[in-house]
Every structure is written in C-alpha cells, then in structure tokens.
Amino acid sequence: MSELAGNGCQIIVPFDERKPLKEIEKSILKKYRKYTWSKFIKAIKDYKLVEEGDKIAVAISGGKDSLLMAKMFQELKKHGQVNFDLEFIAMDPGYHPDIRQLLIDNCEYLEIPIKLFDANIFEVADEIASDYPCYMCARMRRGALYNKAEELGCNKLALGHHFDDVIETTMLNLLCAGNFKTMLPKLNSTNFDGIQIIRPLYYIREESIIKFIQNSGIWPLNCACMVAAKKTGNKRYEIKNLIKSLGDNFQEVEKSIFRAAQNVYLDSVLGWEQDGKRHSFLDKFEVEDK
C-alpha cells in the first residue's frame, strides 16, 4: 500500500489488529477524552459550530482525521443536548481501486453510513496545474463537497482540519505568500448561499489523532492521491518540519503561532484587508490632517 503514497506522505501503521467497534467508540470518551473528545466539544462550544436544527454534511476522505471526526459526531448525536442531523459524504476523486475499497471497508467496519460519489478531480487538477496541483485539487474537492452538501439539503459542511493544519496554514501564508492569514474554525461559503464550513477538530493535535487511530487498529488512507504519488516535494511538509525544528529551541512554539491569530494589534501593522477593502496605517493620518 505504501507504493501508492507520495514521496513525502506519512504512513500510519496500526499497533495491532482492529479492535471491536464498541471498544473504539468507548476509547473516544474514555482513554482519549482529554486529547480528542474534550477538545472537540470545546471547539464546538467556543465557536458555536453545531446549533439547533443544523443538518451537517461530514466530509469523509478516509484519512485519520475524517474517520475520528465522523465517530465523534456520532457520539455527539448520541449523547449531546442539541438536535441536529448528519450526512456522511465521501468523494472518490480518482483513487486507486484498492484505496477506494479501503475507504469503503473502514467506514463499514466503523458503521459510518457514507454516501460515496465519484469525481475525476486528481486527473483534471494534474492537467491544469501539473507543477503544483495540490492547491487546485483542494479547491475542486471543496467545490464538489459543497455541491453534494447542497444536494442533500445541508446547511453546514464539516471538514477534518486539526490544530496542526491551522498553524501550518498560518506559517505557509507568512513565509510563502507574504500575508498573515489563518484557517478559521467556521466561515460562510462565498459561492453556495446558506452553507457554512465548520472545523470541529480545530483544537486537536495531529499526534493525538494518530495515537487514537493506531490504537484502534484502523489502517486509514494515508496519501491516497494518485498525482502526489508521482510528485516530489510539498511546501506543507516543509513547513511541518520547520515548525517541529523551531519547537526544539522555542518553548510551546505551536501554541504561540496559534495564539498569534487571536492577538493581532491593528495599530501596529502596516496594512490589512477587510471585506475586500484594503486599509493602511496611513489612513488615520489622513483623517487627522483633514
């Protein structure tokens, strides 16, 4: 299976055989409560991600993050106090047949009732942006998920981005795009009216998700991209390694990067953009001169 992964892809190998489903579900609320479930609930409460009457499309890629997210949503539905509905949607963007079957088998074992649909995104993204197809692929996949969520009458689309994805995005924008912009816990779609993206794994560290999956005995989809399997290099992996190396010299650097987006002092920046309009620190001087 590792032959299907890209050169920079992390291969997550289970510790043992698959554990019984009930044991896996119990571990979310017990063994991994502090590191996964509690942070899932905190993000939902802090950012009001799940509200009365919501119909949430939970995006299932088959990777470690989306599988855990799906199971936690099922537990929230079972034990929570808010009335909401769930749809589990899984897209095949051009997986190898073995990868597609692994996705189906895992979801059947975990009793995640996915609605699987096809989209030839990998091939199209590679043709449009062959040098670096990842960005184009992500946009196309997002659009396909939006379409499916809308088709099912959902008002929210849940994605499995976690804490490490958030800080890596912040650093990618800073170092590669020259801007300060992070990944938000929720945002309204600009192209699909009435649909909101939510990210309930916002506070959960990737290492906690990996430990949960390995202990469960589940072999998740690792890098299932048939395009990445032929490519070398990925800026996100470089940023991930950079943050790790910074952690050797700066205490809790990950938390500092995360908190930076909560503590932006507009009086001390040269410029910013809000609602599509550019602003400059010079604007206040022009007002004073009038």
Question: Language-model features: where?
Answer:
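The feature marks non-catalytic terminal segments
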Residues: 218-290
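Mobile, glycine- and charge-enriched loop segments
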Residues: 112-131, 191, 195, 268-271, ...
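Short, basic, helix/turn surface patches
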Residues: 138-152, 186-192, 243-260
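Catalytic subdomain that performs nucleotidyl-dependent activation
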Residues: 85-86, 164-238, 242-245
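ATP-dependent adenylation/nucleotidyltransferase module used to activate substrates
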Residues: 2-172, 176-179, 184, 207-215, ...
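Short, solvent-exposed coil/turn elements at secondary-structure transition points
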Residues: 92-94, 120-122, 189, 203, ...
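Short C-terminal domain-edge/linker segments immediately following a structured domain
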Residues: 116-122, 147, 187-192, 229-233, ...
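Electropositive phosphate-/nucleotide-binding environments in soluble metabolic enzymes
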Residues: 30, 34, 97, 139, ...
